Amino acid sequence: MCVEELEGAERLDFGGVAELETTPADFEMEKVCENTVSLDFKQARSSSFVPVIRSGDWSDIGGRDYMEDAHVCISDLANNFGHNSVDDEIISFYGVFDGHGGKDAAHYVRDNLPRVIVEDADFPLELEKVVRRSFVQTDSQFAERCSHQNALSSGTTALTAMIFGRSLLVANAGDCRAVLSRRGTAIEMSKDHRTCCLNERKRIESLGGYVDDGYLNGQLAVTRALGDWHLEGLKEVGEPGGPLSAEPELKMITLTKEDEFLIIGSDGIWDFFSNQNAVDFTRKRLQEHNDLRLCCKQIVEEAIRRGASDNLTAVMVSFHQEAPPQLRVNRTGRVERSISAEGLHSLRVLLEGQ
């Protein structure tokens, strides 16, 4: 597969990430995981704001001896697979696939999930239904088409983002994460599927599974993933449901001019960046050079500097041609002064601590 490059970064790109080992001490119970938010495909045309899509990416093997996982950037999903866009509505596609137990599952999902989505009869008018169905279908196809047992013993988390018009659809199965910058404020676009999530625990237990020492059935750190067909009691080919689910949670929003960029990262990134810290870090770098690929490289390098030893991947999508602006604070009777989002966040933390 190949796509056109956009500013040296918008292309079909392959890389790898891997699951970061997590100790039980890292698990804190969350109260809730968000449910799906729906939006009609046609709403993308309801405003004069037109996103200018740019993207960049970077992967690093980190402290590992091998790269298990993958990512993908496709500027025109339908055209990439020989299909025509509906009403000339271009759909771009981005994904990070964080593999474990080998690279086979991550590479299979990277290579096949976009195609399965495009070839669905309801694409693109019912994208939410299509994406949810395609995750599960790709998972089943991986089990059916693997010709050797080693491939079946691998698994992968998967997070994808699709942009069409002014709509952004994020689908997540696992613990990769997507964070949106809305005028310098971090907006969580996905929930980590780990055993610390209360809704995930309830789902697991309702399907006969259990959590042991922070692991699903004592075997897996994530509660949703594709692959892992070798693990007993978690799912069966052709059977609906199961403690380990390949069905993604979806979140869709309408983009506005306040929305600056989206960061997609493997879990190793988020173990060393909070959502807001990642947004602050990214805004500052983009204001310096406005180079998305370089910014992804800097995010990965900063995670390594902070102690990350896993494979790492960062993908960024910007919705504007220009860099994010400095935020301004009105001071009555005084001249406006610029202050960065990072500075505002630090000030807020300081004031809340008093």
Curated annotation (Swiss-Prot):
Keywords: Hydrolase, Magnesium, Manganese, Metal-binding, Protein phosphatase. SMART domains: PP2Cc (SM00332). Binds 2 magnesium or manganese ions per subunit. Its EC number is 3.1.3.16. Gene3D superfamilies: PPM-type phosphatase domain. PANTHER family: PROTEIN PHOSPHATASE 2C (PTHR13832), PROTEIN PHOSPHATASE 2C 27-RELATED (PTHR13832:SF684). Mn(2+) 2 binds at residues 98, 267, 310. GO terms for biological process: signal transduction. Mn(2+) 1 binds at residues 98-99. This is Probable protein phosphatase 2C 27. Belongs to the PP2C family. Residues 54-319 form the PPM-type phosphatase domain. One of its GO terms (molecular function) is metal ion binding. It is an enzyme of class 3 (hydrolase). CDD domains: PP2Cc. Its cofactor is Mg(2+); Mn(2+). It comes from Oryza sativa subsp. japonica. InterPro entries: PP2C, PP2C_BS, PPM-type-like_dom_sf, PPM-type_phosphatase-like_dom. It catalyses: O-phospho-L-seryl-[protein] + H2O = L-seryl-[protein] + phosphate; O-phospho-L-threonyl-[protein] + H2O = L-threonyl-[protein] + phosphate. Disulfide bonds: none annotated.
